[in-house]
């Protein structure tokens, strides 16, 4: 018999209950006992929902207050030494470990430390009862493989020690606690643990002066780490755990150091098997193809494997299946865990019947392709709010679990003819038959819908020429023209921000009232204009050089543009976690994309009338819009990206024609779109960079094109970054210990650049001294003539006053360096 299973469930809740609860905890608005009570309610509700959807194998330990990798960092006692003052403060006041946990994720600054930095009393993270001056930044964040989710990067010392810890008020390690919690309501779960090899390979050296020279260097810590896995799995066996899912997504990478990797995996899984010989181990891979790594996997003492069939070709799946031992469980990721389209159940049944013909049914588990962390919670609240024809094509997490449940039922109970038609047993509930029939009709309607296709858009894509993918002149010529035009710009160390400014409760309320028609469009427009005025006043008081309008009209840098572009649809509650408590609501691209009307022209040109300084036009680039949306799956992603590129190009032209001299086209997502396999990179990078160039190159030399990139390791794609040919590139760098700058030095980057001077994801206020030190480090790698001074990302999630104080300090730094280098000249 085939069984139904799940790899992971969205954490936030149907109405983002977790986000609100955690943020209230940070602000001291909820007591510890109530906090733990409500967390438990969320977890139990999620387990019950999965059971009610018909899932037999339900995960535990997939829940997290911030990030699953951060959970493992704390669980394994791998807390960097700079957080020792936070740890000690918890010991002194009897806290539960969560202050340290959240400090690693978002930084920690006591009121006393904030006062010393800013001369104002500002509270950072939830306070210690023992008031000390503690000021520590957050750990680095990176994108989780090629998704828009961010994980906290583990840090390892030369002689890193690990120990299994309890935190968060638990009397046992988190995976143990959550298994027992589910068991208390009669739900037997399969705990999810990040595998030891993936955990180490996702990490970095804690010493920025001695970075790892190879991505495999962190494996030196394997033997020390395995002690905690051994202890954890012994505890699993002791409490009656029958099966554990060990996530090893790096097994979809090119693992060139074959013997090193083989020895590491063999050692690790031998230790785990010996510690818990009676537990069935399922190795979960996802986001790519296993390919040659199947030989390594099948040599390990485990009991099963999960295959992502959505990201694997049919020939790859067939090849892998032939090598799996006959005694193993095979988890088939048949439902797309990363997109929102309704599964074609007939097509999936054909695929699964072919697999079962080779493997038999008794060892088959059906599952999503990956954790449903990357998919919204449920379609329940979208009924009547999303265009009905498009809504009929969609499936969110709960709907996907029901698809898995149906496929499991059909494979176990139904018969199939040679024409792939399905015959239900006589006692089948009419609702099951109706469910299948409606699925067939939905998929047929989507294939035939006239909503999807626009012949004019398709024709424009075919007419793209090489001349549309390059600027008229090289950067030195353009730079001279831009400096002549931008007369207020200082010769050295110009300052700017990345775009968005803090969105207060008042801004969010006004937007909500506008969308619910509680205020008129005219009243909302006036409110936005007033916010823009205040934003420009703050920037001028801070003495910034290139200003922004603040983006108060925008909820999200992708959602806003999608609302103006044809081919997009938006949900009311389709939230997914991005990092920590931050959620995003990705638009859904269902058809051909074009720009019926200008998107940013009105507020950008209005803002420019309020200042004599340059006002940046703020746009999101085509690759980022693509990456941060749920994308149609009926044509190549490259085709959709070129369509978006043409739409952005039209907007850039309009801004230039209205006198906007600086236009920023953000592309923070270019690197995250890279396929997991190196052999697939060139094809992706070709169309991704071409799409950006298509959007950015149709301007005069005197128009300065900016772009922003964040959470990116540029070393291995530097030639592609150079090919973007932006006049000013701003990058997230504050969390990366300046390691990105070494790539710019190595490859001789000659355009202007603004590495992030401080981390906006942390509530702490950066000091002048901290930022001066960072600039001094930057100048070891970059020319004074090319360096811009700016934060590392947009300021939307920060508080207005801490933002103002941080920018004042940042401008002080720029002025000091202008004075230093003016004197040198």
Curated annotation (Swiss-Prot):
Binding locations of L-homocysteine: 498-500, 551, 666
Keyword Methyltransferase appears in the UniProt entry: yes
EC number, as in UniProt: 2.1.1.14
Catalytic activity: 5-methyltetrahydropteroyltri-L-glutamate + L-homocysteine = tetrahydropteroyltri-L-glutamate + L-methionine
GO MF terms, alphabetically ordered: 5-methyltetrahydropteroyltriglutamate-homocysteine S-methyltransferase activity; zinc ion binding
Active site per database record: 761
Cofactor(s), by name: Zn(2+)
Residue positions binding L-methionine: 498-500, 551, 666
Pathway in which this enzyme or protein is active: Amino-acid biosynthesis; L-methionine biosynthesis via de novo pathway; L-methionine from L-homocysteine (MetE route): step 1/1
Superkingdom of origin organism: Eukaryota
InterPro entries reported in the protein's UniProt record: Cbl-indep_Met_Synth_N, Cobalamin-indep_Met_synthase, Met_Synth_C/arc, UROD/MetE-like_sf
Biological processes per GO annotation: methionine biosynthetic process; methylation
Keywords: Amino-acid biosynthesis, Metal-binding, Methionine biosynthesis, Methyltransferase, Transferase, Zinc
Annotated positions binding Zn(2+): 708, 710, 732, 793
Binding of 5-methyltetrahydropteroyltri-L-glutamate, residues: 19, 148, 556, 579, 582-583, 628
Role of this protein: Catalyzes the transfer of a methyl group from 5-methyltetrahydrofolate to homocysteine resulting in methionine formation.
Annotated family: Belongs to the vitamin-B12 independent methionine synthase family.
Protein name as it appears in the record: 5-methyltetrahydropteroyltriglutamate--homocysteine methyltransferase
Protein species of origin: Dictyostelium discoideum (Social amoeba)
